[in-house]
């Protein structure tokens, strides 16, 4: 009886944890592939945290009002391996963000690429559905 209860608890824990991990990494749960966007702004803050990094970017609208968008990127390890670091993209950098907006319409998106002023494109990794590292294209 005791062994059966222990096995049931372990099984339930693994099942619940697995569902949570899957939900966390599901692009479609939070972002809309049918709402691609391109934003131009200034990087004001980095958050190099696991499991996804966050970039805070000030975006000026057509009336000159500034709002801060949160852009999700890949894990710190993934970004560093692709050359996206606090040295290559320091706070204050003007950039263009290509990505997909959050389903809830907030000022949040998953980034696909950063495009720097010199035209250099940096892949952001992350959870964007159907997006892969362009440097590995055949």
PLM feature segments, named:
Residues 15-23:
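Sec/Tat signal peptide C-region and signal peptidase I cleavage site
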Residues 102-126:
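OB-fold/S1-family single-stranded nucleic acid-binding modules
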Residues 49-60:
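Short aromatic-glycine-enriched beta-strand elements
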Residues 72-81:
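Short, structured beta-strand/loop micro-motifs enriched in basic residues and often containing a Trp
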Residues 81-97:
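Short nucleic-acid-contacting surface segments enriched for D/E, G, S/T with interspersed K/R
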Residues 5-14:
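Hydrophobic helical h-region of N-terminal Sec-dependent signal peptides
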Residues 41-43, 94:
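Conserved hydrophobic positions within beta-strands
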Residues 22-37:
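Short boundary/loop segments of OB/S1/cold-shock single-stranded nucleic-acid-binding domains
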């Amino acid at each position: 009886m005791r062994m059966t209860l222990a096995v049931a608890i372990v099984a339930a824990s693994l099942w619940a944890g697995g569902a949570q991990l899957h939900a966390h990494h599901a692009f479609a749960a939070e972002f809309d592939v049918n709402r691609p966007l391109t934003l131009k702004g200034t990087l004001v803050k980095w958050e190099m945290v696991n499991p996804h990094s966050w970039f805070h970017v000030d975006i000026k609208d057509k009336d000159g009002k500034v709002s801060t968008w949160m852009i999700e990127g890949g894990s710190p390890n993934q970004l560093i391996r692709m050359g996206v670091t606090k040295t290559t993209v320091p706070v204050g950098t003007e950039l263009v963000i290509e990505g997909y907006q959050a389903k809830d319409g907030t000022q949040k998106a998953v980034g696909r690429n950063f495009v720097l002023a010199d035209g250099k494109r940096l892949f952001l990794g992350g959870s964007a559905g159907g997006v892969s590292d362009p440097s590995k294209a055949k």
